[in-house]
Amino acid sequence: MAVPLPNDSSNAAFSWFTEYQRSCILENGVVPEWFHGIISRKAAEEMLMCKPAGYFLIRVSESRVGYTLSYRAEDRCRHFMINVLPDNQFMIVGEKTVYCSLHDLVAFHRRCPILPYNELLTVACEQGGKTNYVELLFPQKKDVSHRQVEWISSSTATNTLQSNISEENQTSQLQNNSTSHPGRLYPSLETEVSALNIQSTDQPTKPVPKPRTVFASKTPAEETPPQLPPRMRLPSRLQTSTEDRSQGLMPVIPDRQQITPNTPNEGRTQQKNQQQKPVVMSLVHIKKKLKKKRSEDHTYEEIAGGLFQKDATSALESINTNVEGLVENDYQELAEHPISDGIPKSSDRNLPVEYRHPPPFAPGY
């Protein structure tokens, strides 16, 4: 059974919640949307009547120790009391199921309806802008803010006192300097120099920057064109004989050993002349070579034709002599039925040389 609260119910509910139930509501440091703190029954109905059926909230009861579940039905708002058991468990009055936390109770009745009306909890009713749970869940915020304000005010007061003291010290020093020489109309250089020296010793010295070297840019008129480097002399090749050059066996190449020109213009003209000469000479030599090749080909054909005729006649004579010797010394036994082996017979002497038997001393026989 729930214990009723005394006459001063708001303070009793506040002390009970802060001592026993604060850690049960917070889940991972987050306040659930359905928790609305200490609010009255009328305020809960005003919040739920403008919502559709199934909206709900849980509030701290004002008249007893425990919570109250308020939700919107189809035609009205219904309220169910939630008892807090000694082992810090929760149970709706009229039911037998026990829940370990209010989060479990809400999750269960989102799936299973509340008896005897068979109505489910759908959406948590959010607070409209008034946070009724701040005083319950964060009661030390006010004290902390007051302490912070006191500490800030004390720190500002000490800072102002220190600044006033420093200003008074500076003014007193100036007054002492002025009173030390009351008869002077103009300031003395000695006192000002001493004051500057004192200030320079108090302030940290800054490193003096090193002087920078300035490079003057040259105008384009002053810039002279770079001189061409002298060419390396290549080792002289073996001089070819004049006979080879005349016959066209060796190409005529001008000697590369030349005196280096004194000026870049002379060197360029010499390079152009050297590039043009070999081209002309090479064309002349190509024509000479073509003429010589044609004459040599005709001579080679005449010589080769005579030699070939001589070799052919000698070969035919040797073949004829060998064939005659073979016919005289060759004896063959003829079978009753002659068999054609595809080899020409010795009797066929009228056959050409290609179809006759080769001589015994012929190569490859």
Curated annotation (Swiss-Prot):
InterPro entries: HSH2D_SH2, SH2, SH2_dom_sf. Pfam families: SH2. Residues 199-278, 335-365 are annotated as: Disordered. GO terms for biological process: signal transduction. The keyword Phosphoprotein does not apply. The keyword Magnesium does not apply. Signal peptide: none annotated. Residues 257-277 have a biased composition (Polar residues). Keywords: SH2 domain. GO terms for cellular component: cytoplasm. Disulfide bonds: none annotated. Residues 34-125 form the SH2 domain. May be an adapter protein involved in tyrosine kinase signaling. This is Hematopoietic SH2 domain-containing protein homolog.
